[in-house]
Amino acid sequence: IVGGTAVTPGEFPYQLSFQDSIEGVESHFCGG
């Protein structure tokens, strides 16, 4: 679902991962 509209599987073949590093420990905190 993009902007409230269904899309075709594979139409957007990528993902996003926001990550942070605190005191040398990397962690994922959000994605889309």
Swiss-Prot record:
- Which spans are transmembrane here? none
Where does it mainly reside?
secreted
Subcellular localization, as worded in the UniProt entry: Secreted, Extracellular space
**InterPro entries this protein is in?**
Peptidase_S1_PA, Peptidase_S1_PA_chymotrypsin, Trypsin_dom
Q: Name one GO cellular component term.
A: extracellular region
Reaction(s) catalysed (UniProt annotation)? Preferential cleavage: Arg-|-Xaa, Lys-|-Xaa
SUPFAM superfamilies with a match to the protein in the record? Trypsin-like serine proteases
Gene Ontology biological process: proteolysis
**EC assignment:** 3.4.21.4
Q: Which Gene3D superfamilies match?
A: Trypsin-like serine proteases
Q: Which Pfam families does UniProt cross-reference here?
A: Trypsin
Provide the GO MF annotations for this entry: serine-type endopeptidase activity
Keyword annotations of the record: Hydrolase, Protease, Secreted, Serine protease
Q: Where is the Peptidase S1 domain?
A: 1-32
Q: Which family does it belong to?
A: Belongs to the peptidase S1 family.
Function noted in UniProt: High efficiency toward native protein substrates including collagens.
Q: What is this protein called?
A: Trypsin
The organism named in the record is: Penaeus monodon
